[in-house]
Every structure is written in structure tokens, then in C-alpha cells.
């Protein structure tokens, strides 16, 4: 009976006693943590049906294992019930002591987090204030001392300036400066015309407002400088505008300006194109030399192709330059000069852009870094450049000779041009003497010098009057009465013939004609 009553009493006493596990689970911190775990577990189960089935299987397994463990441990628990009761009481007392010492155990997690955040922020704020407040106070003191020193220095400077201005020398200097500035202002007002906008406005201000105090010297000087600069700019702009309008009335200036603009744009295009083409060939040439040492056969084939390409490029450039130099001369002296200047500018720009590549290629050839094709291409470009410059010089000379009349003696004409005068033809002699044949004495010898024209024309005195009376008496009247005829048309060997103004072909045109023939 005693054995049967024991468990009944034990079962009756358990609900009345406090359980440590229940109290721990009832704590807000523990309950909130359990709720978080439960929510996480439920969300994981709902993520996928397969996960939910696996979790349900594990739950059933754990539940069955716990039931089996409780059924197997029941006899042991009944025998050790007194010891478990004593341990439960001790645990409850310790839990009461912890709740008294740590009241945060009774708070929810949200309140604990907010209080923790507040305490951390207050600690950080206090630490920051402990560091920043001394620095701020020190900086304020330093700034205050600096400002006080600056104010003291400014005050001393003002007092010194006022004292110097109140002295006799200062008053004389200020009066002289005021007088000089006033005279300059009067001269400027007298010489410069008043502004259209400022004149009526100044009159209105005088009628409406009372006279103000006299401005300082610095303000007056700045106003005078602004007035002079503004008037200078206006005068310069007006002069430029008038000059432009007058220059446009001159015949030939408008096309010259358009040609200058076109030449500038063409020069910029040429410079940009040449800058894009010019490259620094050091690394490429070094790599090419290394490749040549490894593969000689492939290099020979590549050299042949490169030579052909370079020859084509050089021929194209020469054709372009020849076309530039072979352009027809425009009508008029101004057009010819402008055309020549444009051609010279183009060739100069091309020479300047080719010079770096030519110098680098020559240096690389000396240092055995560049192959022979680079030297040949550079040489070809140099030759084409020299030909272009020669063509330009020939064009300039032709233009000058064509439009500038030079004296006859300055042009070294050969003796062949005067042979027609020294040695007249038989038809001319027949016309001069009528139907009579010319006597052998009156015709000059083939080797006769230029001075023998006097004897032919009958201007020199006879050397032997006894012998020449018969011939002179018959020939002199008819020869003197004959008018001088113009010589036949001759082709001169010099640059131009003074009698007829005609353009002469340059070297580039002659070379093109030879090629075409």
C-alpha cells in the first residue's frame, strides 16, 4: 500500500512545486529566442515540399525516441524522486537570486536591444566629446588670439596712415595726388567723347540726388583705368571694323581672304593627316630585326611586298606633289602670288611632318635597327620633296618673270637673235635695192662683227673716197630711204622674250610632257 501511495503523493505534489525548466522557458529572453528558432524552422519547412517531408519525418522520429526514453527512465525517476525534488528547489532559489541581481532577464529582447543601443551611443558620445571639446576650445582660443592680433595690426596701420595723412608732408602729397588725378580726369573728359548712356543718367542724378562725398583716390584711379580701357577697346574694334570694310572694297582682297581661309583649312588637314601617319618606329623596327634573324625566307617575301607597297606610295605622293606644282597659273599678279604661297605652304608643312620620320629612320639605319626598306622609303620621300621644292622655285621664278618687265640687257641673250639683223636675207636686200642684185661690196661678210651695221646702214664715213664713190653714189639714196623692217619671229633660248609676254612652262610641266611623249 505504501508503494502505491508513494507515486500518487508524488504525482499530486509535482504540479504544486515549481519546475526549473518551466521557469527558464518562461523567461522573456529564452522565450523570444525559442520563438525566433521556431519561426526560422517553420520558414525553412515551407521553403520546399521535400524539406517539409524530411522535417516531418525527423519530428516523428524524435517524438518516438523521447517517448521511449521517458518510458524507460520512469522507474529511475520514481526511485530518485527525493533527490530530484531537492535539486529542483536549489535551482529555483538560484534562479530567484539571478532575477533579483539581473532584472534584464525579465525584459523582452526588443527592450534590451534598445537599451543596449542607447548605452552604447551615450558612451560613444561622451568619448567623442571628451576628445573634441578640448580641441575645439583650443582652436577657438587660437583663432581668437589671431583675430585679436589682426585687428590690433589693422588698427595700428589705420592710426599710422591717419597720422601720416594729417602731417604736413602727407597733406601736401595727398593734395598733389588729388590735383594730378583731377587734371588727368579733366584731360580725359576733354579728349574722350562722353558715353551716350552715362551723359543723360548723370544729369538726372544731379537733378534728383544731392551731391555725395568725394570718392577716395583708389576708387578714382580704378574708375579712370576702366574708362581708358573701355575707350581703347571700343576704338580698336571700330578701327578694325573700318579697316575690314575698306579692305573689302579693294579689288582682289575678298578672293585673297577666301583663299587664305581655304589655305589655312587645307594646312590643318595636312598637318592632322601627317600627325596620324607619323609614328615612332623604334620598337617595331627592333622586333622586325629579331624576326628577320629567325625567319629569313619569310622576310625576303615580306620585303618584296613591302618594297612594292612603298614604291606605290612614293609614286602616289610624287603624283600629288606634281599635280600641286603643275596647277595652271591664275590670272593676275595677285592670284599668281597667292597660288605660289599656297603651294609653298603645303610643301613646307609636308617637309616639317616628314622630317621626324626621316631623321628617326636614318638614326635607326646607323644603329642597325631599321631594315633597308625604311632607308629606301625615306630616300624616296626626300627625293620627291626635293623635286617638289624645285618645282615650287621654278613656278615662283616663272611667275616673277611673267609679270615683272625686266630690262633687255639683264637677260643674257645669245648672238643668234641678232644674226637676222647683221645678215639680212636675199629677199630683203632685193626689196631694198629694187630689181638690182646686191653688189658684193655692200653685203657684209659672215664673220663681220656687230659694229659693221654702220657700214651696212650707210652711217659710217667711207674709208677710201676714191674707190667707193661709184658704189655709194648709187646705193646710198636707196638704202637710206628704205624703212627698217621687223625681223622674223624667233624662238628665244632664255626665260622670256621682252617683245611678247607669254608664260613659260616650268620644270614640272616639262617633265610631265616628256613622260607623256
Swiss-Prot record:
Keyword Transferase: no
Annotated spans, Disordered: 195-216, 286-320, 425-490
GO cellular component entries: cytosol; endoplasmic reticulum; lipid droplet
Acidic residues compositional bias, start-end: 298-318
Residues where Phosphothreonine is found: 85, 223, 298, 300
Matches recorded under Pfam families: Perilipin
InterPro entries: Perilipin (IPR004279), PLIN1 (IPR042998)
Modified residues (Phosphoserine): 81, 126, 130, 132, 137, 174, 314, 384, 386, 410, 433, 439, 460, 492, 494
Region feature Required for interaction with CIDEC, mapped onto this chain: 290-321
Subcellular location: Endoplasmic reticulum; Lipid droplet
Alphabetical UniProt keywords: Endoplasmic reticulum, Lipid droplet, Lipid metabolism, Phosphoprotein
Superkingdom to which the source organism belongs: Eukaryota
Principal place of residence: endoplasmic reticulum
One example of a Gene Ontology biological process annotation: cellular response to cold
UniProt modification remark: Major cAMP-dependent protein kinase-substrate in adipocytes, also dephosphorylated by PP1. When phosphorylated, may be maximally sensitive to HSL and when unphosphorylated, may play a role in the inhibition of lipolysis, by acting as a barrier in lipid droplet.
Assembly and interaction partners: Interacts with ABHD5. Interacts with CIDEC. Interacts with AQP7.
Function: Modulator of adipocyte lipid metabolism. Coats lipid storage droplets to protect them from breakdown by hormone-sensitive lipase (HSL). Its absence may result in leanness. Plays a role in unilocular lipid droplet formation by activating CIDEC. Their interaction promotes lipid droplet enlargement and directional net neutral lipid transfer. May modulate lipolysis and triglyceride levels.
Recorded family membership: Belongs to the perilipin family.
The protein, known as: Perilipin-1
Gene: Plin1
Amino acid at each position: 500500500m505504501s508503494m502505491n501511495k508513494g507515486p500518487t503523493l508524488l504525482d499530486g505534489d509535482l504540479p504544486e512545486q515549481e519546475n526549473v525548466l518551466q521557469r527558464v522557458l518562461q523567461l522573456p529572453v529564452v522565450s523570444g529566442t525559442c520563438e525566433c528558432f521556431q519561426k526560422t524552422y517553420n520558414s525553412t519547412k515551407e521553403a520546399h515540399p521535400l524539406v517539409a517531408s524530411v522535417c516531418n519525418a525527423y519530428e516523428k522520429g524524435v517524438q518516438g525516441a523521447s517517448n521511449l526514453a521517458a518510458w524507460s527512465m520512469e522507474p529511475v525517476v520514481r526511485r530518485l524522486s527525493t533527490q530530484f525534488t531537492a535539486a529542483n528547489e536549489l535551482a529555483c532559489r538560484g534562479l530567484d537570486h539571478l532575477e533579483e541581481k539581473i532584472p534584464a532577464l525579465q525584459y523582452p529582447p526588443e527592450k534590451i536591444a534598445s537599451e543596449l543601443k542607447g548605452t552604447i551611443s551615450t558612451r560613444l558620445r561622451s568619448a567623442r566629446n571628451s576628445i573634441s571639446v578640448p580641441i575645439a576650445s583650443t582652436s577657438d582660443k587660437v583663432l581668437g588670439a589671431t583675430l585679436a592680433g589682426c585687428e590690433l595690426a589693422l588698427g595700428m596701420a589705420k592710426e599710422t596712415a591717419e597720422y601720416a595723412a594729417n602731417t604736413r608732408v602727407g597733406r601736401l602729397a595727398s593734395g598733389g595726388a588729388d590735383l594730378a588725378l583731377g587734371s588727368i580726369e579733366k584731360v580725359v573728359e576733354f579728349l574722350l567723347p562722353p558715353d551716350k548712356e552715362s551723359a543723360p543718367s548723370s544729369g538726372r542724378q544731379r537733378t534728383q540726388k544731392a551731391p555725395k562725398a568725394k570718392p577716395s583716390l583708389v576708387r578714382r584711379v580704378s574708375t579712370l583705368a576702366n574708362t581708358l580701357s573701355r575707350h581703347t577697346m571700343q576704338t580698336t574694334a571700330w578701327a578694325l571694323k573700318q579697316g575690314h570694310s575698306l579692305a573689302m572694297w579693294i579689288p582682289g582682297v575678298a578672293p585673297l581672304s577666301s583663299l587664305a581661309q581655304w589655305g589655312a583649312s587645307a594646312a590643318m588637314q595636312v598637318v592632322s593627316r601627317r600627325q596620324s601617319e607619323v609614328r615612332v618606329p623604334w620598337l617595331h623596327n627592333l622586333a622586325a630585326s629579331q624576326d628577320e634573324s629567325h625567319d629569313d625566307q619569310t622576310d625576303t617575301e615580306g620585303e618584296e611586298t613591302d618594297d612594292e607597297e612603298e614604291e606605290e606610295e612614293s609614286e602616289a605622293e610624287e603624283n600629288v606633289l606634281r599635280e600641286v606644282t603643275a596647277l595652271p597659273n591664275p590670272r593676275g599678279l595677285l592670284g599668281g602670288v597667292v597660288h605660289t604661297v599656297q603651294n609653298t605652304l603645303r610643301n613646307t608643312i609636308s617637309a616639317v611632318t616628314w622630317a621626324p620620320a626621316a631623321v628617326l629612320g636614318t638614326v635607326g639605319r646607323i644603329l642597325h635597327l631599321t631594315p633597308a626598306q625604311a632607308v629606301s622609303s625615306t630616300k624616296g620621300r626626300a627625293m620627291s620633296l626635293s623635286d617638289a621644292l624645285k618645282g615650287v622655285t621654278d613656278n615662283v621664278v616663272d611667275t616673277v618673270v611673267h609679270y615683272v618687265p625686266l630690262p633687255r640687257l639683264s637677260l643674257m641673250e645669245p648672238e643668234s637673235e641678232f644674226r637676222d639683223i647683221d645678215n639680212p636675207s636675199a629677199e630683203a636686200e632685193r626689196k631694198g635695192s629694187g630689181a638690182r642684185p646686191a653688189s658684193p661690196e655692200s653685203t657684209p661678210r659672215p664673220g663681220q662683227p656687230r659694229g659693221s651695221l654702220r657700214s651696212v646702214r650707210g652711217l659710217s664715213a667711207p674709208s677710201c673716197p676714191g674707190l667707193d664713190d661709184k658704189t655709194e653714189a648709187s646705193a646710198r639714196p636707196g638704202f637710206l630711204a628704205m624703212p627698217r623692217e621687223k625681223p622674223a619671229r624667233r624662238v628665244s633660248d632664255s626665260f622670256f622674250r621682252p617683245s611678247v609676254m607669254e608664260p613659260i612652262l616650268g620644270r614640272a610641266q616639262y617633265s610631265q610632257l616628256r613622260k607623256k611623249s
